[in-house]
Amino acid sequence: MEESLPKRWEIELEFVQSLANIQYLNHLAQNNYLSNPEFLNYIEYLNYWKEPEYSKYLVYPNCLHILTLLQNEEFRKNILIPDFMNTVMNDMVKRWQDQDSVFGVTPQSQLEGLNASNGDDTNQPSVEVNGSGSN
């Protein structure tokens, strides 16, 4: 059985989500994609991913924020600056951490869930935050 080629929306989904990778954005800027009018038209076209019927497929929703930022020429120029790129990356990581905290998913709660799933089974080690386990 032959594998079918990916559909256009699958390719666009993958590309839109790749925009959440700040180092990839820097690569695009270094190779002058972010100053190419055709590429910028494509970026503008991809705004349809902000619609709920499409955005529900996104695993990395921060890519939509980046898609918006890419509409700004100053952002496209600044992403070449290492300090700016690092600040954007750090801000994005903080957003992910804050979002996890809002939804109750923290490293501590994940570990507590693992320990609870172990129950009273003494053959299973428990998982502790400091990295040590017990039998």
Curated annotation (Swiss-Prot):
GO biological process terms held by the UniProt record: regulation of DNA-templated transcription
Family matches, as Gene3D superfamilies: Mediator of RNA polymerase II, submodule Med31 (Soh1)
Primary location: nucleus
Residue ranges, annotated region (Disordered): 110-135
Source organism superkingdom: Eukaryota
Keywords linked to the UniProt accession: Activator, Nucleus, Transcription, Transcription regulation
A molecular function GO annotation: transcription coregulator activity
Residues that span the membrane, as ranges: none
Subcellular location: Nucleus
GO CC field: mediator complex
Keyword Nucleotide-binding (UniProt): no
Claim: Protease is one of the keywords in the record: no
Cited function: Component of the Mediator complex, a coactivator involved in the regulated transcription of nearly all RNA polymerase II-dependent genes. Mediator functions as a bridge to convey information from gene-specific regulatory proteins to the basal RNA polymerase II transcription machinery. Mediator is recruited to promoters by direct interactions with regulatory proteins and serves as a scaffold for the assembly of a functional preinitiation complex with RNA polymerase II and the general transcription factors.
Quaternary structure and interacting proteins, as annotated: Component of the Mediator complex.
Homology family: Belongs to the Mediator complex subunit 31 family.
Listed name of the protein: Mediator of RNA polymerase II transcription subunit 31
Organism the protein comes from: Debaryomyces hansenii (strain ATCC 36239 / CBS 767 / BCRC 21394 / JCM 1990 / NBRC 0083 / IGC 2968) (Yeast)
Phylogenetic lineage: Eukaryota, Fungi, Dikarya, Ascomycota, Saccharomycotina
